[in-house]
UniProtKB/Swiss-Prot annotation:
Name assigned to this protein: Large ribosomal subunit protein uL23
InterPro entries: Nucleotide-bd_a/b_plait_sf, Ribosomal_uL23-like, Ribosomal_uL23/eL15/eS24_sf
Pfam families (alphabetical): Ribosomal_L23
GO molecular function, one term: structural constituent of ribosome
Alphabetical GO biological process terms: translation
Subunit structure: Part of the 50S ribosomal subunit. Contacts protein L29, and trigger factor when it is bound to the ribosome.
UniProt KW Ribosomal protein keyword: yes
Cellular compartments per GO CC: ribonucleoprotein complex; ribosome
Length: 100
């Protein structure tokens, strides 16, 4: 298992969607993560950056959509998402706060 030097190389950005907002009420937070990171690296990065305890991490690889342009076809970038569940009694994460 390769360790990345900086935990901010693992966590790219929070996912902004209706589903991710709904999951926040259940202590599940969604992040775009590096495609070559694993669940252990994601867990360590979230615990270091936000100072919380992680119960579990689920990941999803999403293929980029094929899009048509005037000159032919292209493809959006493929992404990896991580659904991070916090432990019971753990503080919530302010992912959209100004202090980040």
């Amino acid at each position: 298992m390769a360790k990345l030097a900086n935990p901010r190389d693992v966590i790219i950005a929070p996912v902004v969607s209706e589903k991710s907002y709904g999951l926040m009420e259940q202590n599940v937070y969604t992040f775009y993560v590096s495609t070559d990171s694993n669940k252990t690296q994601i867990k360590d990065a979230v615990e270091q950056i936000f100072g919380v305890k992680v119960a579990s991490v689920n990941t999803v690889n999403r293929a980029g959509k094929r899009k048509r342009t005037r000159t032919g076809y292209g493809q959006r970038k493929s992404t990896k998402r991580a659904y991070v569940t916090l432990r019971e009694g753990s503080d919530s994460i302010d992912v959209f706060g100004a202090g980040a």
